[in-house]
């Protein structure tokens, strides 16, 4: 969550269950009142993923949409390429070689962009983690996209 003053709060499904997320969203809506808007990444099945992981991914997406609808929080679905085009700059990009093909390493590129835009932010999931959480970076960048587009 990015508040109007730019401060951020995080709630991860790795640390919380759906009930915790519902309480988190309800509290955010109470604090933000009418200015509360959510931006979520528009997801699709990932080629090569197992049926189980695709189902789990879709279930989580559906539950989050359901919570937003139930709490009457307006939301926007943003395709990954849309927010990435707005947020990433050439200096952020990391190229990877996979099977002889070059392509953008989306996780590393988002981490670079998040560090550039929010240099004082700790992007670890919690204080015990040693590495940066790319999901937290993506969530922050999607919020920043929404802020820039006045969504």
Predicted regions: what is each one?
Residues 1-151:
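Phosphate- and other anionic-substrate recognition elements at nucleic-acid/protein interfaces
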């Amino acid at each position: 969550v990015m508040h109007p003053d730019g401060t951020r709060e995080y709630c991860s499904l790795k640390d919380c269950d759906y009930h915790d997320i519902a309480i988190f969203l309800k509290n955010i809506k109470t604090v933000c009142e009418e200015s509360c808007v959510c931006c979520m990444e528009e997801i699709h099945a990932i080629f090569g993923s197992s049926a189980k992981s695709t189902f789990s991914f879709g279930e989580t997406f559906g539950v989050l949409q359901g919570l937003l609808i139930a709490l009457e929080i307006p939301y926007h679905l943003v395709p990954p390429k849309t927010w990435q085009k707005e947020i990433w700059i050439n200096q952020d990009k990391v190229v990877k070689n996979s099977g002889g093909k070059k392509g953008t390493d989306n996780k590393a590129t988002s981490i670079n962009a998040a560090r550039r835009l929010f240099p004082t932010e700790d992007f670890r999931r919690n204080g015990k983690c040693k590495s940066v959480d790319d999901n937290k970076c993506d969530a922050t960048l999607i919020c920043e996209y929404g802020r820039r587009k006045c969504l």
